[in-house]
Amino acid sequence: MVTIRLARGGAKKRPFYHLTVSDSRKSRDGRFIERIGFFNPVARGQEERLRVDLERAAHWQELGAQVSDRVAELLKEARKQQA
């Protein structure tokens, strides 16, 4: 099954996440099909906190990709920002 989920990056105590489309059998930070955005939970000031390609996310959802709980919240937030 294909899932849209977060892959962790960044340094220790400074998390940074990529929104990835990947096979659910692969590891969290492993091989992915497509990277559709990023999420920086520790962004400060003018740093960009969230960027998502909503068109690609919608495309993968139409093809049947499952969305993780946290990514669903982030997609909702991104749609709100865009409106």
Swiss-Prot record:
Gene Ontology CC terms, in alphabetical order: cytoplasm; small ribosomal subunit
SUPFAM superfamilies from the UniProt entry: Ribosomal protein S16 (SSF54565)
Pfam families recorded: Ribosomal_S16
GO molecular function: structural constituent of ribosome
Signal peptide: none
One of the GO BP terms on file: translation
Protein name stated in the entry: Small ribosomal subunit protein bS16
Gene expressing this chain: rpsP
